[in-house]
C-alpha cells in the first residue's frame, strides 16, 4: 500500500469450510496492515491511496521466474535488450522503441507513439497464455508452452512479409518458433498501431507466460533470451530495400 509510507498488508477474506464464493463485492475485500484502530490507520493511509501487489520477482527451477506484472515487464526488457544487441550487430535502419500505457484498455499510448514517430512498420512484443499446465485446454489459446521459445502471431492483421522476416531471423539463429493463431485481432498494441496513419504493417512476437493477469505470473528466462535474439537479428537485417507491404509481396 502506497500511503504516507510504504505499507505491507494482506488481503482479508474469510471463507467457511468448503465454501466457494462467486458473488464477492468490493465491500467484502479489505487489506490488513496490522493496525489496532481506525485512528492509527488514518494516520498512515487515506481514501484513494494506491495499492499494488508486491513487485518482488522469485526465481523458480529451470530458469523460470514468478512475479506480478511480467505482463508486460518481460516485453519492455526484451525490446530494450534487443535494441542494444541490434546496435552491436550493426543495425542499418533507425529503430524507435516505446513502452506504452493503456494496452489493456484504450491502447492510447501506442496510438500516440505511432502518431509521433510515423514508423514504416511495427513489431509489438507481448506475452501470451500457455496451455502447458493442468486445467488449460490447448483449444483455448493454442499449443503454447513455457520454454518452447517465442511465439509468432499468425492472423489476418499480421503482415506476411514481417512474419517471414522474423521466421528467417529465427532460422538463421536455430531458434524454434511457436505460433499463436490470432484471427481478427492479436490482443496487443499492434492492433492499434495497424490503424494509425494510412495503415501500418504490424505483427506481434509473444513471450509464453503462465497464469497471466495474476499476482504470480510465471515466465521462462530462456524464452525471453531467445525473443531478444530473434528480434535483434530481425532488426539488424533490415535495410532500405525491405518492403513490408503484403500487396507487393
Across the structure, where does each feature detected by a protein language model lie?
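N-terminal hydrophobic/helix-forming segments and targeting peptides
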Residues: 1-249
